[in-house]
Regions:
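Interdomain "pre-motor" coupling segment immediately N-terminal to P-loop NTPase/helicase cores
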Residues: 1-11
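Conserved P-loop/Walker A NTP-binding site and adjacent catalytic elements of P-loop NTPases
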Residues: 13, 18-157
Length: 157
């Protein structure tokens, strides 16, 4: 850590490919104070509730929690990223596809009752879904949570 309230991406205990992608492709070299404050707990695998203003980087903290868990702590496990709206799910899938693709992880989306989603839901390392879809999966798929090591709830109100 560079100083109180700051954190250089290069110093994070994450795989080199993740740090390189953040700095190179996304231009992120230093975390914002709310992100830096959350990282010790995230990197320790603790449960975290992050409340911060809009555009303060909460999603990046969630992404890093997912990558740390799937690439370091529980290799071969899966993640679920729950959002309230289909439009937000699409946005998160785009961002996660770029970041996860750089490290060999796949991302799937679950936003409706389309049967074509079924196989993709099972195969995805990271599943982004609406809260309604998540509820449906819990009720209708007995073994849905098997292998899941991290769950992110975004935009809870």
């Amino acid at each position: 850590m560079a100083g109180v309230g700051s954190c250089n991406v290069a110093d994070l205990d994450l795989p080199a490919e993740v740090r390189e992608h953040l700095a190179g492709a996304w231009g992120i070299e230093e975390l914002y104070p709310p992100q830096a404050a959350a990282m010790p707990a995230v990197l320790a695998g603790e449960s975290v509730l992050l409340a911060a203003p809009t555009a303060s980087g909460k999603s990046l903290v969630a992404y890093l929690a997912i990558l740390r868990r799937l690439l370091v702590d529980e290799i071969g496990s899966r993640a679920i990223y729950i959002v309230p709206l289909k439009a937000l799910a699409s946005e998160k899938v785009d961002e996660l596809n770029e970041l996860c693709g750089a490290v060999g992880l796949s991302v799937g989306i679950g936003v409706g009752d389309r049967s074509s989603e079924s196989k993709k839901l099972d195969d995805a390392d990271v599943l982004v879904c609406t809260s309604e879809k998540f509820d449906s999966l819990l009720r209708n798929r007995e073994r849905f949570l098997e292998g899941v090591s991290v769950v992110i709830a975004d935009e809870i109100h």
